[in-house]
């Protein structure tokens, strides 16, 4: 059992707005690759490529635990 309360898990998360949907990835397409603009924190204004699970559309706000990593680009075969 985790010692953290559910609200504590996202207390250090940073909000980011989805600005573009790039495509689907994952073996069965369960992950969406999106470009997001960081809204707060030291990387405010930076645009990142991230993978998101679940339904997402342009304008949605996603909470990022960290803003250092970017997702790899989707390779076309």
UniProtKB/Swiss-Prot annotation:
Extent of the signal sequence: none
Regions that span the bilayer: none
Gene Ontology MF terms: structural constituent of ribosome
One term under GO cellular component: cytosolic small ribosomal subunit
GO terms (BP aspect): maturation of SSU-rRNA; ribosomal small subunit assembly; translation
Family matches, as PANTHER family: 40S RIBOSOMAL PROTEIN S28, SMALL RIBOSOMAL SUBUNIT PROTEIN ES28
Protein name, entry field: Small ribosomal subunit protein eS28
Organism of provenance: Thermofilum pendens (strain DSM 2475 / Hrk 5)
């Amino acid at each position: 059992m985790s010692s953290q309360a559910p609200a504590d898990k996202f207390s250090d998360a940073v909000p980011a707005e989805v600005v573009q949907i790039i495509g689907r990835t994952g073996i069965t397409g369960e992950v969406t690759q999106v470009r997001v603009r960081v809204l707060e924190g030291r990387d405010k204004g930076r645009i990142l490529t991230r993978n998101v699970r679940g339904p997402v559309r342009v304008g949605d706000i996603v909470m990022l635990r960290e803003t250092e990593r970017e997702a790899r680009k989707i390779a076309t075969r």
